[in-house]
Amino acid sequence: MKGLKKKRRIQIIALAFVALAGSTALIGYAMRDGINFFRSPTQVVEAPPPETEVFRIGGLVEKGSLVRGQGETVTFRVTDTNATVPVSFTGVLPDLFAEDAGMVGTGRLVGGVFEASEILAKHDETYMPKEVVDALKEQGVFQHTEDQPQG
């Protein structure tokens, strides 16, 4: 009788482990398209991601690079001062989007051009997204001031 209870308990524990592992795998599989990794322009230039990968890029909009094309198409270059990546975006830019200002874009790298599906701009004079701050610090060009909130 004791051996049967022990065997049954082991079976239940094994079944619970398999169910937990299966549900974790299903959740991970379902979330794979919702995860966008952040890259700096230097990282994109050094190791370009595959064209099918959606990721986020952030940095400063290079001064003098903003060109408004036909309709809602806009091209510009994003830089972290070490590398520059051309960006193409079709849509309405945020009101605070400007040259020499911080931005984060979501999209794909196609033929060396980042085709953005979404563009976000910093929301005031002192804010900069945490990922952009980290990338600029890594390049040694970010200078933090006391009144500059991050992230």
Curated annotation (Swiss-Prot):
Signal sequence, start to end: none
Keyword Transmembrane: yes
One Pfam family matching this protein: CcmE
Periplasmic side: 31-151
One of the record's GO molecular function terms: heme binding
Subcellular location: Cell inner membrane
Cytoplasmic side: 1-9
Presence of keyword Cell membrane: yes
Superkingdom assignment: Bacteria
List of residues binding heme: 123, 127
GO CC annotation: plasma membrane
Residues that span the membrane, as ranges: 10-30
Membrane-protein topology: Single-pass type II membrane protein
Chief location bin: membrane
Keywords: Cell inner membrane, Cell membrane, Cytochrome c-type biogenesis, Heme, Iron, Membrane, Metal-binding, Signal-anchor, Transmembrane, Transmembrane helix
SUPFAM superfamilies to which the protein is assigned, alphabetical: Heme chaperone CcmE
InterPro entries: CcmE, CcmE-like_sf, NA-bd_OB-fold
GO biological process: cytochrome complex assembly
Family the entry assigns: Belongs to the CcmE/CycJ family.
Role played: Heme chaperone required for the biogenesis of c-type cytochromes. Transiently binds heme delivered by CcmC and transfers the heme to apo-cytochromes in a process facilitated by CcmF and CcmH.
Name of the protein in question: Cytochrome c-type biogenesis protein CcmE
Gene (name only): ccmE
